[in-house]
Amino acid sequence: MLSLDFNNELIKAAPIVGTGVADVSARLFFGLSLNEWFYVAAIAYTVVQIGAKVVDKMIDWKKANKE
């Protein structure tokens, strides 16, 4: 919920329920917080992309040597 008070120049924002639920459920897996899971996901994504690039280059190298 967002509350704007123009007289006192205040903006009050209550946390979204989904964020709280996501944080609690994230802590159930290995005790990591939500932003730590983002770090894990970013590292895993990077490793997968590097692996995919290596496989792609190996396939290109095999095709070049076959001809």
Curated annotation (Swiss-Prot):
GO biological process, one term: viral release from host cell by cytolysis
All ranges on the Cytoplasmic side of the membrane: 1-36
Keyword Glycoprotein included in the entry's annotation: no
Main localisation: host cell
Family designation: Belongs to the T7likevirus holin family.
Protein's name in the database: Holin
One Pfam family this sequence matches: Phage_holin_2_2
Protein's cellular compartments: Host cell inner membrane
Keywords: Cytolysis, Host cell inner membrane, Host cell lysis by virus, Host cell membrane, Host membrane, Membrane, Signal-anchor, Transmembrane, Transmembrane helix, Viral release from host cell
Transmembrane segments: 37-55
Reported function: Accumulates harmlessly in the cytoplasmic membrane until it reaches a critical concentration that triggers the formation of micron-scale pores (holes) causing host cell membrane disruption and endolysin escape into the periplasmic space. Participates in determining the precise timing of host cell lysis. Participates with the endolysin and spanin proteins in the sequential events which lead to the programmed host cell lysis releasing the mature viral particles from the host cell.
Mode of membrane association: Single-pass type II membrane protein
HAMAP family named in the record: HOLIN_T7
Gene Ontology cellular component terms for the protein in this record: host cell plasma membrane; membrane
Summary of subunit composition and partner proteins: Homomultimer.
Periplasmic side: 56-67
InterPro entries in alphabetical order: Phage_T7_Gp17.5_holin
Organism, as annotated: Escherichia phage T7
Gene Ontology molecular function: any one: pore-forming activity
